[in-house]
A protein has these predicted regions:
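Hydrophobic/aromatic-rich core segments of domains that either
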Residues: 1-32
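N-terminal accessory/pre-domain segments preceding catalytic cores
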Residues: 32-150
Length: 150
């Protein structure tokens, strides 16, 4: 893509969650060597795939190299944008294990995700619950998927 090589494994993007809910996933779209190696053990790297510019999460603005509380406004905007576009599933990718763990700690473990939802209310007229949501963690790919209750 645009002169760079990427890995795309559409066979691993299972659209069914653990709860049985169907959702389209983009976990394995346009990955570099490091990203694909996190989950694909018996995998031969035939091309030098170092670029990340066309990675799904980077292209959609849902990639966080690092995470801290200052990112809550950005996250509220991401959620509001998804709701405005008729969706309710937000997939976030973090740039490292440390960033992922910090996001889980800040958002999930402390419950600040509900503060983000309340802040999202100010950014959209779409009705949704600020008291209930589902989330799925993928520590192998550093992903956090949010499912907003409408």
């Amino acid at each position: 893509i645009n002169g760079d090589f990427y890995y795309l494994d559409c066979t691993w993007d299972d659209p069914v969650s653990k709860s049985g809910e169907e959702m389209v996933m983009y976990s394995y779209f346009n990955l570099n060597n490091e990203m694909i190696a996190a989950t694909h053990r018996d995998f031969s790297i035939d091309f030098d795939c170092e670029a990340t510019a066309e990675n799904y999460y980077i292209k959609t603005g849902t990639y966080f190299e690092n995470y801290d509380r200052s990112d809550e406004k950005k996250l509220a905007s991401i959620i509001a944008n998804e709701l405005e576009n008729g969706g309710n599933v937000i997939q976030l990718r973090f740039g490292s294990k440390a960033a992922y763990k910090e996001a889980i700690s800040e958002l999930v473990d402390t419950g600040r995700l509900y503060n983000v939802l309340r802040n999202t209310k100010e950014k959209t007229k779409v009705k949704f619950s600020t008291d209930s949501l589902s989330y799925y963690k993928d520590s192998g790919q550093y992903l956090l998927t949010l499912v907003i209750e409408k």
